[in-house]
Amino acid sequence: MRILYEGRRVILEPLLTSTAVVAIGEIGDKTQLLAIVLAAKFKRPVPIILGVLCATLLNHTMASVLGFYAADWLTGTPFRVAVGVAFLVMAGWALIPDKMDDDLKTIGRGGIFLTTLLTFFVVEIGDKTQIATTLLAARFHQITLVTAGTTLGMLIADVPAIFMGEAVTKVVPLRVVRIAAAGIFAMIGAWVLLDTFRLV
């Protein structure tokens, strides 16, 4: 029975943590703003959602692979400390409001799915949620579950935005969301550091 419980925990912890971190971190993020712009321009939610899904899977798989192998190559206390500190830095970054770049407000011509796929993939590079994915993969030493969780988190945040537009960002004040995201990043960072020094 204990083995079954431990097995479920191994699966659920990286999956649920990754989903929660990215779902909250994505609200008000640049990629969510992009999803709103695409929805307003094309008014075709299905190909936009599919484009977001595919772009996120590609982008976050790459990010998870990077985190996974970085954890393999850079083992030991210094690396774990670096991961913990990185999460604390992410907590500070999460408090900074995102804005849509002016050059992304004008989306180029092309098929809706392909346009969404390309623009979303490019905008996600170096974004908070991509970096969070890399750190989560390093923390849990998982590729599949972390990628599945972060992709699900992106969809949880972006699908309502595609259907509801900017109204979705007003359901809960963005300041509250940013504080919640910062709190989650800070807790994970503290957890990693405490675990590294065997304080928990």
Map each language-model feature to its residues.
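Hydrophobic transmembrane-helix microenvironments that flank and shape a buried ionizable site
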Residues: 23-29, 56-57, 77, 81, ...
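Membrane helix-loop-helix hairpins that form the core translocation module of multi-pass transporters
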Residues: 43-112, 160-171, 176-183, 190
